[in-house]
């Protein structure tokens, strides 16, 4: 029997971009933070759980990175899809007001109990159902504050239900955020063109010399 194929969800892309944003901003991460899952609720079929301890002591910074990552990942989605996600998560993706405080952040801030060691008693994964002979890797990110974990849980519940074709995954991980990558491609293309022109020139010279030597 063949091993099941792992499929990506929009939430997987979100986690990858979130980790990337943490590295871009050189944010100090504490990987020794604690996490405890007392109960897992929801539908969980052919899904595998992975916990990532990436704790940030700054609550406001955690929220800002979460919102930026959400906007990065959803930038290629249609207007309708953005509106659906905004409603499900509780964050208006289309709102660019720097003073805007999303509803989900207010709710999480008012209900969360902040401690030095994050203790998640109940984890609600919503619906995590992979198609038959497929698998989904569900990554739980412990961001270091109870409030940010609450927001992350809402994002996970919404995005984990949206499958992504692996062939199109780079449409979501926008390459324009990697100028060095684009610059490298341009340099390689220039070198390639110069190389082709040089080969043609050498062939032309050899043929010209040949006509004088052998005719």
From Swiss-Prot:
Compartmental location: Virion membrane
Residues spanning the membrane: 179-199
PTM statement from Swiss-Prot or TrEMBL: Disulfid bonds are oxidized in the cytoplasm by OPG088 protein. Unglycosylated because produced in viral factories instead of the classic ER -Golgi route.
One term under GO cellular component: virion membrane
Membrane topology, record value: Single-pass membrane protein
Disulfide-bond pairs as recorded: 33-55, 47-128, 108-150
Pfam families: L1R_F9L
UniProt keyword list: Disulfide bond, Late protein, Membrane, Transmembrane, Transmembrane helix, Viral envelope protein, Virion
Subunit and partners: Component of the entry fusion complex (EFC) composed of OPG053, OPG076, OPG086, OPG094, OPG095, OPG099, OPG107, OPG143, OPG104, OPG147 and OPG155. Except for OPG095 and OPG052, each of the EFC proteins is required for assembly or stability of the complex.
Role: Component of the entry fusion complex (EFC), which consists of 11 proteins. During cell infection, this complex mediates entry of the virion core into the host cytoplasm by a two-step mechanism consisting of lipid mixing of the viral and cellular membranes and subsequent pore formation.
Family the entry assigns: Belongs to the orthopoxvirus OPG053 family.
Name of this chain's protein: EFC-associated protein OPG053
Organism field: Swinepox virus (strain Kasza) (SWPV)
